[in-house]
């Protein structure tokens, strides 16, 4: 069953035409908070920011048919490193789908040096990172993981 569900999810870079789907997904405050994503409270400012992210190719979408059910985001950091974040709608969580989606993303983008910060209480997200070769750098209330750079 899990492999069938993974096969139903398709990943690709999101483009400006995907803006309505991305905005609908990010409108779920509980989902964005659980992912540690802080968005502007002003809807116009939020839409402007997401439009810029789409134009810069920072968002990779996870699609179940025509429905956007998740996002993997990368944002440039200092010293040629990228911050990684991801979120998946609750209906699709708990089945290893994000682990598989991150693996697919990494295969499609093998040269990215990535760092991810995860709440210590978010064990599922930590498993996603560990299963995809991320190494724990710092542990506390927020755990920091890195992949692809010594």
Residue ranges: model-predicted function:
Residues 38-57:
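Active-site rim helix/loop that mediates acceptor-substrate recognition in acyltransferases
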């Amino acid at each position: 069953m899990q492999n069938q569900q993974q096969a139903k999810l398709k990943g690709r870079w999101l483009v400006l035409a995907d803006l309505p789907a991305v905005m609908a997904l990010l409108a779920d405050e509980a989902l964005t908070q659980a992912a540690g994503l802080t968005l502007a409270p002003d809807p116009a400012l939020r839409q402007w920011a997401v439009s810029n992210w789409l134009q810069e190719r920072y968002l990779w979408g996870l699609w179940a048919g025509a429905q956007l059910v998740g996002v993997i985001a990368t944002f440039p950091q200092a010293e040629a490193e990228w911050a990684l974040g991801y979120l998946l709608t609750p209906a699709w969580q708990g089945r290893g789908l994000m682990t598989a989606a991150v693996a697919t993303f990494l295969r499609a983008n093998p040269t990215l040096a990535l760092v991810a910060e995860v709440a210590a209480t978010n064990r599922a997200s930590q498993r996603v990172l560990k299963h995809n070769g991320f190494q724990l750098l710092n542990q506390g209330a927020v755990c920091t993981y890195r992949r692809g750079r010594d």
